[in-house]
Amino acid sequence: MYQNKDHTNQRHTVIKSNNIDISNQNSLLDITNKISKLIKKGDNLLLFGELGVGKTTFTRNLINQIQNNFKKNNTEVLSPTFNILNEYQINSLTIKHYDLYRIKQQEELENLSLFEEKDDINIIEWPEILKSYKIKSINYYAG
């Protein structure tokens, strides 16, 4: 399921529907293709779901679709579970892919410098610890 939630600073809505089927590869490619054409600098995508439900697969497809839009070769998109952050540069876009699964305390977040670069696109797996942040976001619930 893909759900869009409005937050105080949200500039635009990417998806207006509350439920989108991404249970198969064609559906996943369709939604990531749509998002890849609408996503803008400064957007935040928060990915919720249990282990193994497809958060990194969603991210991989989205980043590869953005690369395709810019006629760039697809790069390998891996889960940032151990290094917490993987960064991708696609022309003038900087995409930061975070996995906050191992972050347990708010103080640890401060070391990550989340949201400091207003033009970065942030894709965040396991964003539950961010509840104290007021950010504009698009939330993806898998599972």
Model-derived segments and spans:
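Short phosphate-coordinating micro-motif centered on Lys-Gly-acidic
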Residues: 2-5, 18, 105-106, 115-143
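N-terminal pre-Walker A segment at the start of P-loop NTPase domains
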Residues: 9-34
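Hydrophobic anchor at the beta1->P-loop junction of P-loop NTPases
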Residues: 45-47
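P-loop (Walker A) phosphate-binding loop of NTP-binding proteins
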Residues: 50
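Conserved lysine of the Walker
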Residues: 55
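Post-Walker A helix-loop "phosphate-sensing" segment adjacent to the P-loop in P-loop NTPases
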Residues: 64-76, 90
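Conserved nucleotide-sensing/catalytic segment adjacent to the nucleotide-binding pocket
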Residues: 81, 85-128
